Structures are given as structure tokens and as C-alpha cells.
């Protein structure tokens, strides 16, 4: 239980803004940390859903509401995944050999490629939320659990690059099996929750998550020879923009079909 409690505190101190007393990052203390990362996603999804309920009474402009929707996940997670996203974008944009890309991942400075992509990312996510149908919000709220569960599962199951520090997250024997079982359970819960909310929204949302995961696999193994923590963080940000993107594109296509029939 002591190790579980230590992992819980580390998960919330590293992956959220919620206060948790800092403890030493050792392999023993981090053995179960991935179990609690999707719980942060559940809190983000819940708060986002509550924002959907109260925002019409607080603001009149959809744009401001969309900006808040885009910023809430970043704010509540403490920007935990953005750093890895920046570094991976920098490495991919360099078009250098694998060894140089891995070196860029270790660089703590952000290049102009990362800054440009970041600005484009936030413009796109704000635009998506500003046009998102209200009935899609409950489904997308589950997406914050799904993205983090896939993040955890990949760290446990995928081969790591030689430069990766992900081994700190990976236990051995029984503890590793427990973490994998929890990740699979989170994935099942989020998928079932999406389908129960609205199957017509859930399917494109899951397609978006699948596309992001396949792209993640391609980037990790083709460009870097395995995953690193930064590349896994890159996946979370890509997944959380692909899900609303595919949902919105599907909604637009459906409206165009209906308009064409009329």
C-alpha cells in the first residue's frame, strides 16, 4: 500500500496541478504511477462537462467558451504533456538522422518549429471547440481518460528507444501485469462510456483516437526506433486533437448530406 500511495502522489504531482506532496522519483515509488494518470483525465473530462452546463449562463460568446475548453485540459494537467509534444515536433521537423532526432529530444530548449506548431495547434483546437455540437461534449469528455490509458499501455508494452527513461515507469512481473490490466480496464470503460452516451459521436471519436495511435506507432518506430516519454506525451496531445477533429468533420459531413437531400 505504501508504494501505491507514493505512486498516487507522484501521478498527481507530475500530471496535474492538484497539490500533492513531492516525494523522490524512484523506480519503487513510480511502479504504479501509470494507474492514476487516467484518473487525472477523468477529472478533466468531468470539469469540462460541467463547463458545458454552466457556460451558457456565464458568457454570451462561443469563442471565449471555446478558448476555455482548449485551455482547461492544459491548465488542469499542468501542461504535463506539452513539453514532450514540443520536443517531438522539433525533432520531427528537423528531418535529421535518428541519432540527431534523439539528441533534440534531450534538448530542453524549444525551437521555432515547436513554437509555430504550438500556435497552430491552439488555433485549431479553439476552432474545433467553437464549432463542436453540444451533444458531442459528453463523449469527448471520456477521451481524456482514453488518451491517457493508451499512453500508459504503450509505455508498459512498447519497446523503448535506447535514450528512453520510460523504464522508470515499468515494473516487473506482477506489478507490470497489474498496471496493464488497469490500462485495459480504463480503455474498456471509456469506450463503453462513449458508446452509451451517443454511438454516432462515439464511433468517429474512436476513429480519431485510433488514427492518432497508429500515427504514434509510426513516429515512434520509424523515426526514433522505439518510444520515449516525450514521444508518448506527443501522442496524448495528438490524440486529444484528433478526436474532436474527426467528430466535427463527421458532423459537418452529416449536415451536408441532410442539406443535399433537402
Question: How does the language model describe each region?
Answer:
Residues 31-48, 91-135, 139-140, 177-194, ...:
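Multi-pass membrane catalytic core of lipid/isoprenoid biosynthesis enzymes
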Residues 34-89, 138-142, 201-222:
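Membrane-embedded alpha-helical segments that form the functional core of polytopic membrane enzymes
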Residues 17, 81, 90, 118, ...:
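Alpha-helical transmembrane segments and their lipid-water interface positions
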Residues 20-24, 80, 100, 104, ...:
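C-terminal ends of transmembrane helices
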Residues 98, 149-184, 224-227:
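Solvent-exposed interhelical
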Residues 1-25:
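Membrane-proximal soluble regions of multi-pass membrane proteins
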Residues 29, 218-242:
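Interfacial loop-to-transmembrane junctions
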Residues 20, 43, 47-55, 72, ...:
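Alpha-helical membrane-inserting segments
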Amino acid at each position: 500500500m505504501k508504494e501505491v500511495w507514493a505512486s498516487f502522489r507522484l501521478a498527481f504531482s507530475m500530471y496535474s496541478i492538484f497539490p500533492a506532496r513531492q516525494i523522490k522519483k524512484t523506480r519503487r515509488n513510480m511502479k504504479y504511477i501509470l494507474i492514476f494518470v487516467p484518473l487525472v483525465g477523468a477529472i478533466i473530462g468531468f470539469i469540462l462537462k460541467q463547463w458545458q452546463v454552466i457556460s451558457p449562463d456565464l458568457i454570451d460568446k462561443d469563442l471565449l467558451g471555446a478558448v476555455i475548453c482548449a485551455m482547461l485540459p492544459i491548465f488542469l494537467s499542468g501542461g504535463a504533456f506539452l513539453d514532450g509534444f514540443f520536443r517531438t515536433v522539433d525533432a520531427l521537423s528537423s528531418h535529421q538522422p535518428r541519432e540527431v532526432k534523439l539528441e533534440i529530444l534531450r534538448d530542453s530548449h524549444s525551437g521555432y518549429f515547436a513554437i509555430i506548431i504550438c500556435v497552430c495547434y491552439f488555433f485549431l483546437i479553439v476552432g474545433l471547440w467553437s464549432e463542436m455540437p453540444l451533444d458531442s461534449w459528453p463523449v469527448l469528455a471520456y477521451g481524456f481518460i482514453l488518451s491517457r490509458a493508451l499512453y500508459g499501455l504503450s509505455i508498459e508494452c512498447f519497446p523503448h528507444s535506447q535514450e528512453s527513461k520510460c523504464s522508470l515507469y515499468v515494473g516487473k512481473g506482477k506489478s507490470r501485469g497489474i498496471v496493464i490490466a488497469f490500462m485495459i480496464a480504463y480503455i474498456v470503460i471509456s469506450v463503453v462510456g462513449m458508446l452509451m452516451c451517443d454511438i454516432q459521436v462515439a464511433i468517429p471519436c474512436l476513429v480519431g483516437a485510433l488514427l492518432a495511435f497508429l500515427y504514434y506507432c509510426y513516429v515512434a518506430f520509424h523515426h526514433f526506433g522505439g518510444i520515449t516519454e516525450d514521444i508518448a506525451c506527443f501522442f496524448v496531445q495528438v490524440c486529444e486533437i484528433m478526436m474532436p477533429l474527426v467528430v466535427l468533420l463527421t458532423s459537418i459531413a452529416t449536415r451536408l448530406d441532410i442539406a443535399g437531400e433537402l
